[in-house]
Design a protein with these regions (language model features):
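Gram-negative outer-membrane beta-barrel transporters
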Residues: 297-308, 395, 401-404, 423-505
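Flexible loop and strand-edge segments within Gram-negative outer membrane beta-barrel domains
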Residues: 140-151, 165-247, 277-278, 282-283
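Extracytoplasmic beta-strand/coil segments of soluble accessory domains associated
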Residues: 4-47
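Outer-membrane beta-barrel signature, preferentially recognizing the C-terminal barrel domain
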Residues: 184-210, 241-243, 343-406, 414-440, ...
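C-terminal beta-signal and adjacent terminal beta-strands/loops
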Residues: 501, 520-565
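Short acidic/polar hinge/loop motifs at secondary-structure boundaries
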Residues: 43-71, 85, 89-91
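Short strand-turn segments of transmembrane beta-barrel domains in outer membranes
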Residues: 68-74, 85-120, 135, 139-148, ...
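Surface-exposed extracellular loop regions of Gram-negative outer-membrane beta-barrel proteins
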Residues: 115-140, 174, 218-228, 260-269, ...
C-alpha cells in the first residue's frame, strides 16, 4: 500500500495496529491521525467517517510518485482539512513494462502483486496514449491469535501524456479484513474491521515552464465498513457504515510580471449512512476551500535572493462557521560558495478543519464511543523557522516549529468512565525540532532523522486520565535508513527507529523502543530481471505499543521473488 513506504520516513510517524498495511494512523509533527491529510494530484482524498480510513488509498504504489510531506505554509496552501500536515502524491508517468512478485512467510503469510503498463507511439500533438493495470493480494493469520488479515486490490488507469502535460483517469477497488486484540478499544477483546474502498479519479496537470503550472481534478470515493467490537461475544452487535465523497479541486502557480500567484480551490460533498452513528445533527456536508497567495522576489548582493509570500485561505461548510486564515513566508536564498544553507526561511500559517462523523454522531451518553454533536471548527496557528541545504552527496533540512491548536478533537479515557472512549476538544500547544540529512552515493544511501516534541494540553472540564492520540507522541525519535549496494547483485536495507514516547496510562509496555527491519536482496548478474528477497520486520521482537493498549505485532519474516520485464 502507499502507506508502506512511510513506515520509517523521518517526517512521518506511522502508528500501526498489526502491520501498517493492516491499519495505520499517520501523524505529522506530533499531530494525530485526523490532522493528517492526503492528496493525489489536484484532489484532496478524505474519509468523512473517521481519519483512521484516510490512508485507505486503493492505488498501486507503482502508479504514484514518491510522497511529499507538506507542513507549515505549504500545508496551509496545499492541504485540506489537515492542521498538522499533508501527504501529497502525483500520478506517475506510465512506461511500457511490468513486474510480478510473490512471497511467503511465517504465520501463514503469502503475498502477490502484478503490474503492467503499455505506452503507444507518439500521436497528434506529441502526446502518447498509455494504460496500466495492477493487482495485489495478501493473506496472513497474524503474529497474534485472532490477528488475521486479508487484502485484495485491483487498479486500472488510462493516461494521455506529452512534454507539457498529463491527464490520468484512474479506478481502484480494494477489500481488507483485519482482526486484532484491542484494535480500537482498550477492553481486552478481539475486534475486527471489514472494509471495501472504491476510488475513481480524473486528474490533469499542465507544466507551463519556470515553475508555473495548473492542475485540476475530480473524484468519487466510497468506503463500506463493517466493524465488530467483540468477535467472540454476542454484544454489542456489529456496526455498519458507508460513506460517499464527491470532490473537485484545482491548484496552480502563474507568473505575471514580478509576481507569482499561488492558488487553489476545493469543493467536497460527503454523505454517511450508518446504523450506529445516528446521534448527530446531520449526515451530509459540503466543504468549500479557496486560497490565494502572491509572492515576489528581490535580488540582493552576494548571490542572495529574498522571496516574500503572503495570502489567505477561506474555509467553509454548510454546517459550520467559516474561517479566514492568513499565510506568510519569508525566504532568503543564498547561492554564494560556503554559505551555511541554500535557503533560510520563516513562516506563519493559520489553518482550520472540522471533525468527522464518528466524533460528531456517536451517542453522547452511552456506548463504547461517546461523541459530541456540538464539536466546532478546529483551528491551528503554525510558526516555523528553518533551513535547507545541499553539498556534494549530502542534502539536509532543519526546522524549529510551534503549533497552537484550539478545539482539537481527541479521544480520551477516564477512570470515572472506564468502558468508553470520549471525543473531547482540547487546546494544545506543540513545540518541536525536526532534522533530516540524506546521503546518496554509488554504494551507500543514508537517511537520518531526529524529531523532538513537547506538548502542553488543556482539556478544560473533561476528565482525561489518558489520551489515545493527542498525547501519544515521541518526545524524542531517531530514524536511520541505510541501503548498502554490496556488489555482485547483493543489496542490504536496514531501517531503524529509536524513540522515547510520552508516558501514557493506557500503554502497558515500556515507553522506550528500538525498532528495526532488514531486507537482503540478490539480483543474479546474468539475469537482472529477477530479484530475490528475504526480509524481517520487528527484528528485535519489540512489544512497544504504537497506539496505547494495542498489542504490537511480533517479529515476522517473509521471502519472495520479483520478476520485471
Amino acid at each position: 500500500m502507499p502507506v508502506s513506504a512511510l513506515a520509517f520516513e523521518p517526517l512521518v510517524d506511522v502508528q500501526a495496529r498489526n502491520m501498517g498495511e493492516a491499519q495505520a494512523d499517520v501523524a505529522i509533527r506530533g499531530g494525530i491521525f485526523e490532522t493528517t491529510g492526503f492528496r493525489a494530484g489536484a484532489v484532496a482524498l478524505y474519509d468523512p467517517q473517521t481519519g483512521h480510513y484516510s490512508a485507505e488509498i486503493p492505488a498501486a504504489p507503482a502508479m504514484l510518485s514518491a510522497p511529499t510531506v507538506l507542513t507549515g505554509a505549504d500545508n496551509a496552501l496545499g492541504g485540506w482539512n489537515a492542521n498538522a500536515g499533508t501527504i501529497a502524491y502525483e500520478w506517475r508517468r506510465v512506461r511500457t513494462g511490468g513486474m510480478a512478485s510473490a512471497g511467503a512467510g511465517d504465520n501463514r503469510l503469502w503475498r502477490a502483486e502484478a503490474y503492467q503498463g503499455w505506452v503507444s507511439p507518439v500521436g497528434a500533438g506529441g502526446r502518447r496514449l498509455a494504460a496500466d493495470v495492477a493487482g495485489a493480494w495478501s493473506d496472513s493469520d497474524g503474529s497474534r491469535t485472532f490477528g488475521e488479515s486479508r487484502f485484495r486490490r485491483y487498479n486500472a488507469r488510462l493516461q494521455l501524456a506529452g512534454d507539457g502535460g498529463q491527464t490520468d483517469l484512474f479506478y481502484g477497488w480494494q477489500s481488507k479484513f483485519i482482526s486484532w486484540p484491542n484494535l480500537y478499544t482498550p477492553y481486552n477483546v478481539i475486534e475486527s474491521d471489514d472494509l471495501r474502498t472504491e476510488l475513481l479519479v480524473l486528474n490533469h496537470r499542465e507544466e507551463l515552464g519556470g515553475g508555473d503550472f495548473v492542475a485540476a481534478g475530480a473524484y468519487w470515493r466510497r468506503n463500506v465498513d463493517h466493524y465488530v467490537y467483540n468477535r467472540t461475544g454476542a454484544t454489542p452487535g456489529p456496526s455498519n457504515h458507508t460513506t460517499w465523497v464527491r470532490g473537485a479541486g484545482a491548484e496552480g502557480r502563474l507568473t505575471t510580471g514580478t509576481f507569482a500567484w499561488n492558488f487553489s480551490a476545493n469543493f467536497i460533498a460527503d454523505k454517511l449512512e450508518s446504523d450506529t452513528l445516528t446521534w448527530g445533527r446531520f449526515n451530509t456536508r459540503n466543504h468549500t476551500r479557496a486560497s490565494l497567495a502572491p509572492e515576489t522576489s528581490w535580488a540582493l548582493a552576494g548571490a542572495r535572493k529574498l522571496t516574500v509570500l503572503a495570502g489567505a485561505v477561506f474555509d467553509d461548510t454548510n454546517r459550520d462557521a467559516s474561517a479566514v486564515s492568513p499565510v506568510a513566508r519569508l525566504a532568503l536564498a543564498n547561492a554564494a560558495p560556503g554559505a551555511l544553507a541554500d535557503e533560510l526561511y520563516v513562516s506563519y500559517a493559520a489553518s482550520s478543519q472540522v471533525a468527522t462523523y464518528t466524533a460528531l454522531n456517536s451517542r453522547p451518553s452511552a456506548g463504547l464511543f461517546r461523541g459530541d454533536p456540538d464539536l466546532g471548527r478546529e483551528k491551528a496557528r503554525n510558526t516555523e523557522l528553518g533551513l535547507k541545504g545541499a553539498r556534494g552527496n549530502w542534502a539536509w533540512t532543519a526546522a524549529v516549529f510551534h503549533r497552537s491548536e484550539r478545539g482539537l478533537v481527541d479521544w480520551i479515557y477516564s477512570t470515572s468512565l472506564p468502558n468508553a472512549r470520549v471525543a473531547s476538544a482540547v487546546d494544545i500547544d506543540t513545540t518541536g525540532i525536526e532534522l533530516v540529512a540524506r546521503y546518496t552515493g554509488r554504494r551507500l544511501d543514508l537517511v537520518l532523522g531526529y524529531t523532538g516534541l513537547r506538548k502542553d494540553a488543556d482539556y478544560g472540564n473533561a476528565s482525561a486520565d489518558a489520551s489515545f492520540y493527542a498525547l501519544n507522541f515521541p518526545e524524542h525519535r531517531l530514524t536511520a535508513a541505510v541501503t548498502v549496494r554490496a556488489g555482485r547483485g547483493w543489496e542490504i536495507r536496514l531501517d531503524n527507529e529509536a524513540r522515547r514516547q510520552k508516558p501514557n496510562a493506557l500503554r502497558v509496555t515500556g515507553d522506550d523502543a528500538v525498532l528495526s527491519a532488514v531486507e537482503v536482496s540478490y539480483t543474479p548478474p546474468r539475469w537482472s530481471a529477477l530479484r530475490l528477497t528475504a526480509a524481517v520486520d520487528n527484528l528485535w521482537d519489540s512489544d512497544f505499543q504504537d497506539v496505547p493498549a494495542v498489542p504490537a505485532a511480533r517479529r515476522q519474516w517473509v521471502a519472495g521473488a520479483t520478476l520485471a520485464w
